Curated annotation (Swiss-Prot):
Function: AP-1 family transcription factor that controls the differentiation of CD8(+) thymic conventional dendritic cells in the immune system. Acts via the formation of a heterodimer with JUN family proteins that recognizes and binds DNA sequence 5'-TGA[CG]TCA-3' and regulates expression of target genes. Required for development of CD8-alpha(+) classical dendritic cells (cDCs) and related CD103(+) dendritic cells that cross-present antigens to CD8 T-cells and produce interleukin-12 (IL12) in response to pathogens.
InterPro entries assigned: AP-1, bZIP, bZIP_sf
Gene3D superfamilies linked to this entry: 1.20.5.170
Protein name: Basic leucine zipper transcriptional factor ATF-like 3
């Protein structure tokens, strides 16, 4: 039975830098600083992304409310138009100006008086 290389040397090689050369404490410090800097940058990026999503959500809610207000206004205006159309229709039935045979395109001093019965 032959034994392979000891487990410690395999572990040591996986920790070592490329090329299987041991790292100096200076390299280890650089690696730790780089990882910390990367961790902080990733945290900052996630926070920024969350803030952006929150802002978009607030904007969406605001636009939904504005849309709802505008839809209610449209509904009210449609109802007002319907009502005024009915009023106009009723008025047209008895308006003496519409019944008058004179052409109102011509300028007159008092076109209403000329159509009214005397």
């Amino acid at each position: 039975m032959s034994q392979g290389p000891p487990a410690v040397s395999v572990l040591q090689r996986s920790v070592d830098a490329p090329g299987n050369q041991p790292q100096s404490p200076k390299d280890d410090d650089r690696k730790v600083r780089r990882r910390e800097k990367n961790r902080v940058a990733a945290q900052r990026s996630r926070k920024k992304q969350t803030q952006k999503a929150d802002k978009l959500h607030e904007e969406h809610e605001s636009l939904e409310q504005e849309n709802s207000v505008l839809r209610r206004e449209i509904s009210k205006l449609k109802e007002e138009l319907r009502h005024l159309s009915e009023v106009l229709k009723e008025h047209e039935k008895m308006c003496p100006l519409l019944l008058c045979p004179m052409n109102f395109v011509q300028l007159r001093s008092d076109p209403v008086a000329s159509c009214l019965p005397r």
